[in-house]
């Protein structure tokens, strides 16, 4: 089985950054990405219009249901202190 990389990152609809690029990069290095989306970035080729952070309870649900053990955790954009604490909890779990 391939090594698991747990990714916390935002979703960029232009695929120029965030979870889409992270997942592609993880795949390119021969590992398997497991991604938890932390935000949605409303943007186009001219720039970012808005960043919508997911409620920390949604992030927590995704953390709590994980049934794989990541070898690496990659952290991107995190919205607030509560979400940071949840990501820290995930690090402690693994």
Each model region followed by its residue ranges:
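Extreme N-terminal starter segment of soluble prokaryotic enzymes
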Residues: 1-6
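Short beta-strand segments
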Residues: 8-9, 36-39, 76-78
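Short, contiguous strand/loop micro-motifs
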Residues: 9-10, 50
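N-terminal basic/disordered segments at the start of proteins
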Residues: 11-31
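Surface-exposed, flexible loop/turn segments at secondary-structure boundaries
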Residues: 13, 41, 81
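N-terminal glycine-rich anion-binding loops that anchor highly charged ligand groups
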Residues: 28-42
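Ribokinase/PfkB-type carbohydrate-kinase core domain
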Residues: 44-94
